[in-house]
């Protein structure tokens, strides 16, 4: 795919959505919508996504809009006006706002998408409201997610340190979780997999370890066994992650003081 600048993408997406709103039945509902571009952090995010958002009250007033009932029932759908360059997702504003308040991974990816979106049409200030909503963090849910990732990666590292025959899937899962937990700890965000490595690269811990993690990935893909220096990289990364966790939550959490926690697994942690 050809490289495209942010300005070019905004111009093309604005032109595309304007053309859509000249068509029946879209021309009758355009004044009630918010339209946003989900700006990609990587050129691999293709086709680009445009979200069209209506309030439930507006949808109820669209007596002749054929998609009305489906949007009200399911909360969102993909429009048949999508093209090879742009995919249109249509949302109920109320349902979308509700999705942002959930704590599962899909909702947290949605939060990331909203935070990184660009307003194309915003007749009712809904884009601003959604961005503000996406920044609100349920601290308990956030801690639970970090705890679950922390304990999962802790278990994998323990297996690696005690078993030279861990499979490739385990190492790949480890690197994915490293990137996930790094973003959660430094930026309180949960990027989609397509942009996860790119986002991890911008973190302080990412700048320190990304090249090393890619080195480990290359060894895995080439079928080589991990050497002691590779395991040392993993343990040093986990030590730094543990320090970030303690800096964020303190060392009073039960899951940080469990007998199987890193305080006990890594001999040089303290």
Give the role of each language-model region:
Residues 34-91:
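Catalytic metal-binding acidic patch
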Residues 29-33, 115-123, 255-259:
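Short N-terminal helix-initiation segments at or just after the protein's N-terminus
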Residues 21, 25-26, 41, 260, ...:
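Generic low-complexity segments that are intrinsically disordered, proline-rich and/or Lys/Arg-biased
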Residues 133-270:
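Conserved nucleotidyltransferase catalytic core and NTase-mimicking acidic/glycine-rich helix/loop elements
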Residues 59-61, 97, 188:
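Intrinsically disordered, low-complexity acidic/polar segments
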Residues 1-37:
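Helical scaffold of the NTase/Pol beta-like nucleotidyltransferase catalytic core
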């Amino acid at each position: 795919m050809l490289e495209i600048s942010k300005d070019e993408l905004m111009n093309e997406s604005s032109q595309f959505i304007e053309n859509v709103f000249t068509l029946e039945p879209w021309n009758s509902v355009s004044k009630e919508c918010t339209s946003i571009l989900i700006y990609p952090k990587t050129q691999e995010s293709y086709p680009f996504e445009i979200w069209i958002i209506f309030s439930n009250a507006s949808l109820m007033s669209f007596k002749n809009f054929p998609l009305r009932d489906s949007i009200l029932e399911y909360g969102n759908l993909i429009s048949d006006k999508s093209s090879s360059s742009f995919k249109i997702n249509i949302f109920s504003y109320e349902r979308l706002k509700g999705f942002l308040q959930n704590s599962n991974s899909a909702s947290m990816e949605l939060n990331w998408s909203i935070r990184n979106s660009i307003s194309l049409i915003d007749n009712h200030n809904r884009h601003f409201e959604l961005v503000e909503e996406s920044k609100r963090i349920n601290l308990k849910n956030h801690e639970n997610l970090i705890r679950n990732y922390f304990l999962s990666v802790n278990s994998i590292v323990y297996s690696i340190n005690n078993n030279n025959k861990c499979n490739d899937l385990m190492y790949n899962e480890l690197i994915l979780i490293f990137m996930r937990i790094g973003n959660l700890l430094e930026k309180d965000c949960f990027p989609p997999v397509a942009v996860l490595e790119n986002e991890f690269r911008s973190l302080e811990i990412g700048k320190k370890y990304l090249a090393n993690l890619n080195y480990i990935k290359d060894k895995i893909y080439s079928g080589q066994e991990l050497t002691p220096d590779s395991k040392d990289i993993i343990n040093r990364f986990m030590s730094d992650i543990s320090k970030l966790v303690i800096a964020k939550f303190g060392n009073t959490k039960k899951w940080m003081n469990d007998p199987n926690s890193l305080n006990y697994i890594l001999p040089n942690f303290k």
